[in-house]
Amino acid sequence: AAQVLLEASLSIGTVLTRDNRYFISKAGWFVLKDKMARVNMDFTQEICYQGMFDLEKTLQTGKPEGLKVFGDWPTIYEGLSSLPSIAQEKWFAFDHYYSDNSFTEALNTVFAKPVKKLLDVGGNTGRWAEQCVNHNAEVEVTIMDLPQQIGLMREATKGKNGADRIHAHPANLLDPEIPFPTGFDAIWMSQFLDCFTEEQATSILQRAAASMNENTSLYIMEPFWDRQRYETAAYCLTMTSLYFTAMANGNSK
């Protein structure tokens, strides 16, 4: 068992051999020690792997055919609260890793001018909302998301500092008849719009615009593959898009 694994590792460069002994390479060290590598590999194993068997069918139908390995939902977002515990853990580890690293700079941008009420669209488990209420002692944050996500958010923020200033507005954002709530100084969308088709994203933005007044600011943060500094980052994003197509909703990146 050790021999076949070491020989495979030798071929992919995670171990090296010298004087009939194996030792770890720099790439192997990063696989073991680098948090991003672990987050990505765990995510691929627990969320993506089995469902990717149905990628071709997904491309033909425009539906997340791979999602059936976990349950019968129109998109993965309705099913997040019902995923197997290990899959749910790795989903959120992946999701939080990439959002958490951007919070400090984003907070400075959003709160560069006074914000008393902020609408967090697609706020998921409330990580950004928590950051906002900890950063600013007065801001009230409302999370607009699916009812299932709102339930996860309530559990995640329960008893935490500022949780009394985090509110919920459950809604299916893909329903073009659902209006956005009004009266906000800022609207925040992070790693959100690229989860939908161009038509769906346009509908969301049109309804957001209709809810805004002349003083409302709209902030959108998205990772675009063709705006990356490093080639490897672009590679990772385009490959992750294949997962989103097969597993998330069948038509997104």
Can you annotate each of these PLM segments?
Residues 1-11, 16-17, 112-113, 117-253:
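Alpha-helical subdomain
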